[in-house]
A protein has these predicted regions:
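The canonical Cys-X-X-Cys-His
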Residues: 37-46
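Outer membrane beta-barrel
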Residues: 50-52, 74-84, 98-229, 246-262, ...
Length: 449
């Protein structure tokens, strides 16, 4: 097993840069040590991406709360487990793995997560991918934020520099941090989705400006630009994966939130308009415009139980001029719609039972969605729908947990069932595979220290 030298060099450079930064607050290896609070203060299940009200405020204010001291603002994370699909895949999902029943280390990540000054904070991640077997640049969000008062209103204003549209978002109803928060790279997944749902992750760099006014109205706008082939090679993502974004890709976000006793509500909209060159050497382009609605509900009584519900509906308009001209699509325009709804019951911030429903649908295209083993469509359709059930346990992360704040662990069992996959239930790919053959089981462990 070998690791690309440029990616290793990038990881080392990232560490050295932050260690050399003049830390007014003395950076720490984790946000828990920085704030002095347990992980349960920010996370609904004491560990993982799902945020509490305090967690959203911490992120909004640039990761700058707290004055804890430690010389190294570093943390490590590991994700892995056992994955199995109902029917073995036609070929191994990645080199060095079998077509089914795989035990794997999926991710090993190094985090730089700390405040850098009273108004600047960072969340930066470099990850070793267990299926691809190399290091690469991962989610990064560097923020400047400060409180302001004007015209009788209190506000927080800030700027985020990040490399994944929605990674900077405060809610778990947008793609970057959505349920089920973890998945296996070694089982089948739907072959398509909106551009905003991770297609550009780490392939772009953007800046957005945001504000939250009077704790209710959130507004954000900015733009993303594509990164060069050379940059992607240097950070372990490879030029062949470049999306070749042309010009700037505008991003917007608006939301309204309110709290009534033990009930929290938010609803909003977000979107992205991106033009891409499928062939980086040719000028022809495809344009994707994503517009979405989303909502969150949290019930957090004084007792041990809590309920979290998230929902989103993304509509994507596709202008496929480049693909149509190249014969890669049989019509120049198309669309996608992606609906996701999830609900979780959480007990003592240690146990969780969640159910998520997903439905992706779009216009038929017999070339764009052609028959192929496993990933293809006999009907020329992207339509995929199903459900994901997830049971989890977090033994640490509370105020009285042992080894706090140095270690946290999340273990779980995830089961995904498909009613339809790429346009069909039986023989959906034209090679005899059924949608239920892609049903999968994932037993996982998620460790941070």
């Amino acid at each position: 097993m070998s690791t690309p030298a440029p990616a290793c060099a990038f990881t080392i450079l990232l560490v050295l840069v932050l260690l050399a930064f003049p830390h007014g607050a003395h950076a720490v290896p984790s946000y828990a040590r920085q704030t002095g609070f347990p992980c349960s203060q920010c996370h609904t299940l004491s560990f993982g991406p799902a945020l509490t009200a305090y967690g959203r405020q911490f992120k909004l204010n640039g990761y700058t709360f707290g004055t804890g001291e430690h010389p190294l603002p570093l943390a490590l994370m590991m994700q892995g487990g056992f994955s199995r699909s109902e029917t073995p895949q036609p070929a191994a999902p990645a080199p060095h793995f079998a077509s089914n029943d795989n035990l794997s280390l999926d991710q090993l990540s190094l985090f730089l997560a700390t405040r850098l000054s009273d108004h600047i904070g960072v969340f930066a991640q470099a990850t070793y991918s267990g299926d691809a077997r190399h290091f690469n640049w991962d989610n990064t969000d560097i923020r400047y934020a400060r409180p302001l008062s004007f015209a009788g209103a209190d506000a927080v204003v800030g700027v985020s520099i990040n490399n994944n549209p929605t990674v900077q978002d405060l809610w778990n109803s947008t793609p970057a941090w959505a349920y089920p928060y973890i998945s296996s790279p070694l089982v089948p997944h739907g072959s398509t989705g909106p551009i905003i749902s991770g297609t550009l992750a780490q392939l772009v760099l953007g800046a957005t400006a945001y504000t939250l006014v009077d704790e209710h109205v959130y507004l954000e706008a900015g733009a993303y630009r594509g990164l060069s082939d050379r940059w992607l090679d240097n950070v372990g993502l490879y030029a062949a994966n470049n999306a070749h974004v042309r010009g700037g890709a505008p991003y917007w976000r608006a939301a309204y939130q309110l709290t009534a006793d033990e009930h929290y509500f938010s609803f909003g909209t977000f979107g992205l308009d991106v033009t891409m060159r499928p062939d980086g050497a040719a000028p022809a382009t495809n344009r994707y415009t994503d517009a979405a609605l989303d909502a969150t509900y949290q019930y957090t009584p004084k007792g041990p139980g809590a309920i979290v519900v998230n929902a989103s509906l993304i509509h994507e308009r596709q202008q496929l001029g480049a693909s149509f001209s190249a014969g890669a699509a049989d019509k120049p325009t198309n669309h996608l719609d992606a609906l996701e709804v999830d609900a979780s019951f959480i007990w003592r911030q240690a146990w969780s039972a969640g159910l998520g429903l997903f439905d992706v649908s779009g216009g038929r295209d017999l070339v764009l969605y052609a028959p192929a083993p496993l990933s293809g469509s006999l009907a020329g359709s992207p339509d995929t729908r199903g459900a994901t059930l997830q049971l989890e346990y977090v033994p640490f992360g509370k105020i009285d947990s042992p080894l706090r704040p140095w270690v946290n662990l999340r273990i779980g069992l995830q089961y995904t069932a498909y009613a339809s996959f790429n346009g069909g239930a039986a023989n959906y790919d034209g090679f005899g595979r059924s949608a239920s053959g892609n049903d999968s089981l994932f037993l996982f462990a998620w460790l941070a220290f």
